[in-house]
Amino acid sequence: MLEVQIYKKLAEFDLDISFQIEDNILGLMGASGSGKSMTLKCIAGIETPDKGRIVLNGRVLFDSEKKINVPIQKRNVGYMFQSYALFPNMSVYENISVGLKARKVKDVDIVVKKVMKQFQISELAQRYPKQLSGGQRQRVALARLMAYEPDVLLLDEPFSALDEDLKEDLLQELKNELQISKPVIFVSHNKEEVNYLCDLKYKIKEGKII
């Protein structure tokens, strides 16, 4: 379960968000600059709320009163950026394995091959991001996240840069891949995407759920 209760003063408005989810896919909708991505960044530890509390599976990640603020690398949160953030000079295999090596995970090769098989990208192991289609890049990015065995997945507008035809195909792929027993937050300004993927839906306007 993910429990979020945060407040952060921003230049345009005050971010004041509270919600909790279990093994659901939560869709956060709203216009650009409404506070959706900032909410994800606070959960991930990229940004720090002014006050509040974030609890993941009973583990306190942030508590302003108790002065708890767990570092990004220790939160076990999977964050997928709009651009997928793949390393252009690394192969698919290297993109997935590099973070595991940094975390000193045992049996890196076994873990990498397992997630590549799971996301049907084994044949792409030695290719580079520029040699991949949009759908393949998305699968690699998800495989890299899942290799870390995160406790929650945060997906920040993963379709924003794609054309409509490709987006339709990838929505179906993503829906299949997200049948997992953990909380997922999907951020989008597209109502159709959220309705298709998500069990729960919240709309954010000027930093508040409406």
For each feature predicted by the language model, list its residue ranges.
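Hydrophobic anchor residue at the start of the ABC signature
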Residues: L142
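A short, proline-enriched helix->beta-strand linker immediately N-terminal to the Walker B motif
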Residues: A147-D151
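Catalytic Walker B motif of ABC-type/P-loop ATPase nucleotide-binding domains
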Residues: L153-E157
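Conserved ABC ATPase signature
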Residues: Y128-L132, Q136
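Conserved H-loop
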Residues: K182-S188
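ABC ATPase NBD coupling module
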Residues: L61-G78, A102, D109
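Conserved ABC ATPase "signature" region
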Residues: R59-S64, K106-L124, K175-N176
